[in-house]
Design a protein with these regions (language model features):
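Intrinsically disordered, low-complexity and often Lys/Arg-enriched segments
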Residues: 1-10, 14, 189, 196, ...
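Short, flexible domain-boundary/linker segments around small modular repeats
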Residues: 1-3, 11, 115-148
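Amphipathic alpha-helical segments
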Residues: 1, 19, 24-27, 141-176, ...
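Positions in alpha-helical segments
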Residues: 15-17, 95-98, 135-139, 155-158
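Low-acidity, Ser/Thr- and Arg-rich intrinsically disordered low-complexity segments
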Residues: 172, 176-209, 215-219
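A short beta-sheet element
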Residues: 55-116, 125-129, 133-137
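Non-catalytic DNA-recognition/assembly elements of restriction-modification systems
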Residues: 16-53, 176, 211, 219
Length: 219
């Protein structure tokens, strides 16, 4: 988010790029003004079930009770604090993962889009394992538009995410087919160089290396 200046030289809280049908400034809030941050809890007293349990690394196991049912964005309390992810449905979270709920003037999907733009490592409170506190998150200032504009932005961003995910799947399916066709005994790895990602296949039988450049969208 940046500010622009109108013809009267007044600073306006609006993005440089915007859908043309929307006008008016985005309003500044603290996160705590528009949603609540929920704490995860221990799940070991629960029985096995069909409700997923999430930690900072993603899915862990399934239990028979839910901590919350609905749309949410998860954000790590400890560990991977800079990888928020969206979920819709019943779930349980452990105490290393926060979740959002009780939205007021902000939609759950736009919350996810907004959380993707925050430099969470900037708010790290530990010298060892990265950590965030609920109090710190709640005080972060954000700018949000009206609900109609939020919905349009979120619809576009989720469509892009889906397209990227599809391209990832197609790439790895093609790669597996290539490996199978060559009957390779390989080590499959990837590395990033600048904005580009490369995948390389090491064949221990024939002793050769194949390096495949991949779009920066596929990691």
């Amino acid at each position: 988010m940046t500010t622009t200046i109108n013809n009267e030289h007044k600073k306006l809280n609006v993005p440089n790029l915007r859908f043309p049908e929307f006008q008016g400034e985005w309003i500044t809030y603290k996160i705590k003004d528009v949603l609540s941050i929920g704490n995860g809890r221990d799940y070991k007293h629960l029985s096995n079930g069909e409700i997923p349990v999430f930690g900072t690394g993603g899915y862990m196991t399934s239990v028979d009770e839910c901590l919350y049912d609905g749309e949410t964005t998860f954000i790590g309390r400890k560990g991977s604090i800079n990888k928020p992810f969206y979920y819709n449905g019943k779930f349980w979270t452990v105490d290393t993962l926060f979740y959002t709920h009780s939205f007021n003037g902000i939609t759950p999907k736009f919350t996810y889009c907004l959380f993707q733009t925050i430099n969470w490592l900037k708010y790290n409170e530990a010298s060892g394992v990265p950590s965030l506190s609920k109090d710190t998150i709640e005080k972060i200032k954000i700018m949000i538009p009206g609900l109609e504009e939020q919905n349009k932005i979120a619809k576009l961003m989720f469509a892009l995410d889906e397209r990227i995910s599809t391209q990832k799947i197609l790439f790895w399916v093609s790669m597996r087919s290539f490996i199978a066709s060559k009957s390779l005994a390989i080590l499959l790895c990837s590395f990033a160089l600048g904005s580009n990602t490369f995948v390389f296949l090491i064949d221990f039988k024939e002793r050769f290396l194949i390096v495949v450049p991949v779009s920066s969208d596929v990691k």
